[in-house]
């Protein structure tokens, strides 16, 4: 079975073709970073219009890369939510339309389930069950995963997502958009210990998180100090250290609560080198294992949607002829695969 996956939930247009025997056959990705750079963030209307322009050409490119035609495709998977409603509707409309034209089933995919299952694309996929840390610009949550669709949210951010806090703090520091990766790069030049940021909500029980206070703490620290390059690097180091430490503390608690020793980290922030190092150290300390996707599959992409869609189609799930987008869609509302 071959599935084409379409991802248009925010500011990346991703198309991929996945074969249940051969694995990933093609992967096309277009980022709208340059389009939104002048605005310092994603402009939903511009994102939607650009998806309209790019999705069909990328579908053609993905087919060409895999040396396939539409007749070789057995199903179409598209991101139906959560995300920007206009951007979602572009992918959903195109996905549902080409499925109808090609005479194959279509299946809506949950964006965060796609991220959660992205490590399954690797040569050493994680076996169930495990604890998943889904950490991106729009979501930060800890999920107990017993199987595909068997999700229990253990905790989540009550305000800003971790990736959002990275980007907003980077903007406060005068870094270009998107600032999160640039802040992490700047942090590599920072001096450990010069600044000490708090670890929010780690002094109380529970697995919920909060990152808006770190952004405020960073703003106050920036105002109170010189704006030379080394000071900015030291602040970036302290901020990243606090975010990573907070996430690792929560992961450790989640593993204790569930009795598990396997953790999956996925989403855009899962590409953060410091976070990976600290989670690997945690796993080694407890005799556990940590899994994450390759860097190109940490950000939004069509490969994760194609894979997740494959699992749903095999379970007999399909979409009707109507087009739906669900900008808010809790992951624990998904049906388990039987």
From Swiss-Prot:
Protein family (similarity comment): Belongs to the KAE1 / TsaD family.
Protein name stated in the entry: tRNA N6-adenosine threonylcarbamoyltransferase
CDD domains per record: ASKHA_NBD_TsaD_bac (cd24133)
Pfam families for this protein: TsaD
Compartments in which it is found: Cytoplasm
Reactions catalysed, as given in the entry: L-threonylcarbamoyladenylate + adenosine(37) in tRNA = N(6)-L-threonylcarbamoyladenosine(37) in tRNA + AMP + H(+)
Free-text cofactor note: Binds 1 Fe(2+) ion per subunit.
Described purpose of this protein according to its UniProt entry: Required for the formation of a threonylcarbamoyl group on adenosine at position 37 (t(6)A37) in tRNAs that read codons beginning with adenine. Is involved in the transfer of the threonylcarbamoyl moiety of threonylcarbamoyl-AMP (TC-AMP) to the N6 group of A37, together with TsaE and TsaB. TsaD likely plays a direct catalytic role in this reaction.
């Amino acid at each position: 079975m071959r599935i084409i996956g379409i991802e248009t939930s925010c500011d990346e247009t991703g198309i991929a073709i996945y074969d249940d025997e051969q694995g990933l056959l093609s992967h096309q990705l277009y980022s709208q970073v340059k389009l939104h750079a002048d605005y310092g963030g994603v402009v939903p209307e511009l994102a939607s219009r650009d998806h309209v322009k790019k999705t069909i050409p990328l579908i053609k490119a993905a087919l060409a890369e895999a040396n396939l035609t539409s007749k070789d495709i057995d199903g179409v998977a598209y991101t139906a939510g959560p995300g920007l409603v206009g951007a979602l509707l572009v992918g959903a409309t195109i996905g549902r339309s080409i499925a109808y034209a090609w005479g194959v089933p279509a299946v809506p995919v949950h964006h965060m389930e796609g991220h959660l299952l992205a490590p399954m694309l690797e040569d050493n996929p994680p076996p169930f069950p495990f604890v998943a840390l889904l950490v991106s610009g729009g979501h930060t949550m800890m999920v107990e995963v017993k199987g595909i669709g068997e999700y229990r949210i253990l905790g989540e951010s009550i305000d800003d997502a971790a990736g959002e806090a990275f980007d907003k703090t980077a903007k406060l520091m005068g870094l270009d958009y998107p600032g999160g990766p640039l802040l992490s790069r700047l942090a590599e030049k920072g001096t450990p210990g010069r600044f000490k940021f708090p670890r929010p909500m780690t002094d109380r029980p529970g697995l919920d998180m909060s990152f808006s206070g770190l952004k405020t703490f960073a703003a106050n620290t920036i105002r109170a100090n010189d704006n030379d390059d080394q000071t900015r690097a030291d602040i970036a180091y302290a901020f990243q250290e606090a975010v990573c430490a907070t996430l690792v503390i929560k992961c450790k608690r989640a593993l204790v609560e569930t009795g598990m020793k396997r953790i999956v980290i996925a989403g855009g922030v899962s590409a953060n080198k410091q976070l990976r190092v600290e989670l690997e150290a945690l796993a080694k300390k407890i005799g556990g294992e940590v899994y994450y996707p390759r860097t190109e599959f940490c950000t939004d992409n069509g490969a994760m949607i194609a894979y997740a869609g494959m699992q749903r189609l095999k379970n007999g799930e399909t979409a009707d002829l109507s087009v739906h987008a669900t900008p808010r869609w809790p992951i624990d509302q998904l049906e388990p695969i039987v």
